[in-house]
């Protein structure tokens, strides 16, 4: 099985061309479910390791270039992934599946993507919705006031100062908020954000499905940009987000339209050994 690994701002993904349904046939031979296959594939140290797996599949609507099936590292399916969508678009372009201007299908809806140059990809996310301001969540680690928005997947955004951001235990606090009854039953992603002196925003994210802090989160960065703009913390509708990996993501808000732009990297491509299963 040919696999390709890309990373976008520190989020890494295993991408497989499954337009002929080959993957499901292979994992059936292995006696695995798709969820078990993904979990094993994403394991660090003993396997390939990744934040998620993307299967490129045939589009249901013939006017679109492809559809995807996105899986978190824990094997669960996800509606959307911002950095994953940028990596998937570059993969599709480099494999001649799609041109530079791409439309593809996700559970959250259609995503438009544009190949800006050899590495940079810009995507228009699905319209954001369900924005709620000033929600107080009480946890064993304290009470946290934040703002909820769905950018294809649910996100809770908490603004803090830079010192607090640096010293925060994102794993513990993020997990407590992610599983809080307020967000039941599906839970939420949790973002801690600090404005810098130059007007950009630093972000740390606890990702649902990965169940831990990640080096970046595209939809989380979008949620941060949306809230920063709507709450008046950013004077511009173009918001610079600095991820934990140190890379810059550019978020542009135009009414209910949100654009995510940043770099991607092709890490490797090769044949998967079934010995890991």
Curated annotation (Swiss-Prot):
Enzyme Commission (EC) number = 5.1.1.7
Task: Quote the catalytic residue positions.
Answer: 81 (proton donor), 217 (proton acceptor)
Which residues make up the annotated site Could be important to modulate the pK values of the two catalytic cysteine residues? Answer: 155, 207
Q: Name the principal localization, coarsely classed.
A: cytoplasm
Q: Domain of life of the organism in this record?
A: Bacteria
Q: Which UniProt keywords apply?
A: Amino-acid biosynthesis, Cytoplasm, Isomerase, Lysine biosynthesis
Q: In which pathway does it act?
A: Amino-acid biosynthesis; L-lysine biosynthesis via DAP pathway; DL-2,6-diaminopimelate from LL-2,6-diaminopimelate: step 1/1
Q: Which GO terms describe its molecular function?
A: diaminopimelate epimerase activity
Q: Which InterPro entries match?
A: DAP_epimerase_AS, DAP_epimerase_DapF
A Pfam match = DAP_epimerase
Q: Which reaction does it catalyse?
A: (2S,6S)-2,6-diaminopimelate = meso-2,6-diaminopimelate
Single Gene Ontology BP term? Answer: lysine biosynthetic process via diaminopimelate
What does it do? Catalyzes the stereoinversion of LL-2,6-diaminopimelate (L,L-DAP) to meso-diaminopimelate (meso-DAP), a precursor of L-lysine and an essential component of the bacterial peptidoglycan.
Which family does the similarity line name?
Belongs to the diaminopimelate epimerase family.
Q: What is this protein called?
A: Diaminopimelate epimerase
Species the sequence originates in: Hydrogenobaculum sp. (strain Y04AAS1)
């Amino acid at each position: 099985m040919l696999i390709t690994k890309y990373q976008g701002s520190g989020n890494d993904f295993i991408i497989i061309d499954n337009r002929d349904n080959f993957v499901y046939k292979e994992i059936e031979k292995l006696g695995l479910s798709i969820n078990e296959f993904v979990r094993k594939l994403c394991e660090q140290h003993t396997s390939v390791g990744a934040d998620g797996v993307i299967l490129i599949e045939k589009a249901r609507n013939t006017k679109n270039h492809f559809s995807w099936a996105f899986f978190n590292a824990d094997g669960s399916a996800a509606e959307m992934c911002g950095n994953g969508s940028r990596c998937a678009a570059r993969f599709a372009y480099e494999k001649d599946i799609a041109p530079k201007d791409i439309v593809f299908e996700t559970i959250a809806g259609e995503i438009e993507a544009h190949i800006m140059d050899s590495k940079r990809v810009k995507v228009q996310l699905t319209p954001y919705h369900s924005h709620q301001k000033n929600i107080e969540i009480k946890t064993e680690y304290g009470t946290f006031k934040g703002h909820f928005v769905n950018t294809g997947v649910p996100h809770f955004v908490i603004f803090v100062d830079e010192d607090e951001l640096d010293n925060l235990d994102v794993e513990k606090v993020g997990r407590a908020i992610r599983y809080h009854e307020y967000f039941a039953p599906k839970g939420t992603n949790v973002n801690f954000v600090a404005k810098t002196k130059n007007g950009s925003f630093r972000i740390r994210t606890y990702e649902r499905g990965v169940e831990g802090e990640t080096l970046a989160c595209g939809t989380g960065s979008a949620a941060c940009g949306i809230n920063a703009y709507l709450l008046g913390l950013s004077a511009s509708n173009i918001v610079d987000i600095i991820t934990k990996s140190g890379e810059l993501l550019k978020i542009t808000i135009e009414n209910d339209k949100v654009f995510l732009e940043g770099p991607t990297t092709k890490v490797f491509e090769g044949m998967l050994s079934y010995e890991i299963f």
